Amino acid sequence: MESSFQELYKKGLDIGEQQKQRQKELLKQQKLRRQQEQDDYRPLQNQEKPVPRKKSGKRSGHQKGIPYRPQLSEWLRHKPDDLNEWLLVPCPVGKRCLVVASKGITKAYSKGGWMFVNFRSSLPGDWQLQKGETILDCVYVEDADTFYVLDAISFGLQEVQECEASFRFYWLRARFEEHDYDKISENNEKKFKLLDHFDFEDPSAVEQALHKYPFFPENKPDLDGFLFYHKEASYVCRETPLVCWLFPFMMEDVLGLPVNKCYKAPEDYQPSHVLQYMDAFEQKLAEHRRTLKEQKKKVNEQKEDPHTMEAEEDVESDEYDSLKRVLDQQRRLELGEFDMDCAEPPSADGC
């Protein structure tokens, strides 16, 4: 797979065209893999879970507890030719994490694999339904103490990682309609809310979602941006071109779809140079990473203990959220007071 992608770079294709080609190649590979697995089906409990690449010996211990990582998106650098084959998911500001219900307990793990909370839930794998394992891809909003569910790797005895995104979303919707996972109870200590998805085959539904402001009641939580899932894509525990991302103010410039005027763009954003803005954002992110590495190097010179290591990993795993918060604060300062017609309450810092 890597060699075919390297060929795209050798051909000198622009980044947007490279993304198109990688999307087609991955869809082809995933479809073939699903067909092979159907021909040689194995129950979930007998499947070998993916083993992540170890970054270093000192961090291998915590990875044994969570052999998965969240699926990460790329910038959407072009309007897909098959836009009707994509789903739109509005994403709130919060802490990206994986929630695992297994062996009678539910645990939430940061992007770096560190457990930051454990509790009881009514998800399959916890409470009375301890058979199987549930792994949900979520955004945790601390102020509301709520997990907003994006996607799933497994749900009880049902393995869905290799299923198409359209089926995964359908399956989750059906399960959430059957159970009150968004209600606090003795056996469900935290709320789980399934995020809505909108099919580009229904332009009116997408248009309504883009013009809704605030998207979440009372703007709590804030809308961070929009995720785009290809309907036929499997869930992969890494960055993938089959899940893409745009900030609200980019929607019209990339897709030709206007959004509510209350979604303000930064002053340095130029609609005709949206790709350059993405590149500049990535450059700022790279600089932020270098700063983090320097800070971690200083920490490593001190005596290490598990708490120090955990703090390091949390900083690294949430580096994107940290940078986003800095840029958002910068943008708010540039804008000054919000337009009174679009007034919004102070937003919580992204975790």
Curated annotation (Swiss-Prot):
First-listed, main subcellular location of the protein, grouped into a coarse class: nucleus
Lineage per the UniProt record: Eukaryota, Metazoa, Ecdysozoa, Arthropoda, Hexapoda
UniProt keywords, alphabetically: Coiled coil, Cytoplasm, Nucleus, RNA-binding, Transport
One cellular component (GO) term of this entry: cytoplasmic U snRNP body
CDD domains: Snurportin-1_C
Gene giving rise to this polypeptide: Snup
A Pfam entry, by short name: SPN1_m3Gcap_bd
Keyword Coiled coil: yes
Superkingdom of source: Eukaryota
Region (Disordered) residue spans: 1-66, 294-322
Annotated localization: Nucleus; Cytoplasm; Cytoplasm, U-body; Nucleus speckle
Cited SUPFAM superfamilies: DNA ligase/mRNA capping enzyme, catalytic domain (SSF56091)
Skewed-composition ranges (Basic residues): 52-62
Residue ranges of coiled coil: 274-330
GO biological process: snRNA import into nucleus
Acidic residues bias spans: 311-320
Self-association state and partner proteins as the record states: Interacts with components of the snRNP complex including SmB and Smn; these interactions are RNA-dependent. Interacts with importin-7 msk but not with importin subunit beta Fs(2)Ket; the interaction is RNA-dependent.
Regions of compositional bias (Basic and acidic residues) in chain numbering: 8-42, 294-310
Function per UniProt: Functions as an U snRNP-specific nuclear import adapter. Involved in the trimethylguanosine (m3G)-cap-dependent nuclear import of U snRNPs. Binds specifically to the terminal m3G-cap U snRNAs.
Name of the protein: Snurportin-1
Similarity-based family: Belongs to the snurportin family.
Gene Ontology molecular function: any one: U2 snRNA binding
